[in-house]
Amino acid sequence: MQSLSLNSSSLQTPAMALVLVRPEAETTGSTSSKALQEVVVKLAEELMRNGQLDDSSPLGKLLAKSMAADGKAGGGIEDVIAALDKLIHEKLGDNFGASADSASGTGQQDLMTQVLNGLAKSMLDDLLTKQDGGTSFSEDDMPMLNKIAQFMDDNPAQFPKPDSGSWVNELKEDNFLDGDETAAFRSALDIIGQQLGNQQSDAGSLAGTGGGLGTPSSFSNNSSVMGDPLIDANTGPGDSGNTRGEAGQLIGELIDRGLQSVLAGGGLGTPVNTPQTGTSANGGQSAQDLDQLLGGLLLKGLEATLKDAGQTGTDVQSSAAQIATLLVSTLLQGTRNQAAA
């Protein structure tokens, strides 16, 4: 993101002068705040090459389609600025950035970050197109889709491998995902979308008070990306485990997990008592020892399960945050990859 830093020298460009000297309504018809205008112009300049829009990046492709629909295909910097300004308000809200004029310096860079994270998040929603039996995707979106697939391959516990061996390979086979594959892919999109929303919020409250994206609707206050780690790890996501058979299976699996932990060197923590003198080996003391042994194994199994589930959740969220950052960079990759190298 350093190459997009907004400083006073980088903003003194002919395009910026065009926007700031004349009323915005006379140039693009926008009512955006001055701070947002500056961000729009900076992004537009990043997308230009030889006086024309470079549509080799995901954001460039999206703008090219929008400009073509408005009869502005092949337009110059003014048309690109107008199209980008329109796109931002369509995706992020009519009043996005309305209160940003009170900020300067770091606040402007925060607004840039909010714009890019917001656009990346909105583009996730359009990656898959519903079809009979599943969804399809466009070759134009492969730069972003590959990042999502890599995230899924990096977290096989959350996203088991498809028949093709990997999610990256799945995208190479054809442009169709069946119902199960679509569900897994949408789950990944939700997790990464949440991270993009978090990063957008962390950038500051400038756009949030002016009609930004707000809280992602995919997650409620009582929901969790990972679900119930104990239930999910042993009986499968969405299974309450309330029936007697399921409870027995759960206990058995926890005891087995505890035994594996002990054999791996974990120990039970509490030694099993030896029978007292005068107590029959087949009497009450043996039953007590067995209860203690099973209880210890059950506890070790529970500890191991919760530890693994918690670690998995942390790893998934950390991985998602990294992919979210890569997706933001990918938006302009076609035009600035050499500069970022």
Swiss-Prot record:
Effect of residue 313 to A: In strain: NV
Effect of residue 25 to T: In strain: NV
Entry-linked Pfam families: Harpin
Signal peptide start-end: none
Location of region: 2 X 4 AA repeats of Q-T-G-T: 276-314
Sequence repeat placement: 210-216, 265-271, 276-279, 311-314
Domain of life (superkingdom): Bacteria
Outcome of mutating residue 221 to S: In strain: NV
Subcellular location: Secreted; Host cell membrane
Outcome following mutation: residue 205 to G: In strain: NV
Induction profile: Regulated by HrpRS and HrpL.
Region (2 X 7 AA repeats of G-G-G-L-G-T-P): 210-271
Keywords: Host cell membrane, Host membrane, Hypersensitive response elicitation, Ion channel, Ion transport, Membrane, Repeat, Secreted, Transport, Virulence
Record annotation: effect of changing residue 102 to N: In strain: NV
GO cellular component, one term: extracellular region
Record's comment describing the protein's domains: The glycine-rich region is characteristic of harpins.
Record note on quaternary structure: Homomultimeric.
Protein name (record): Harpin HrpZ
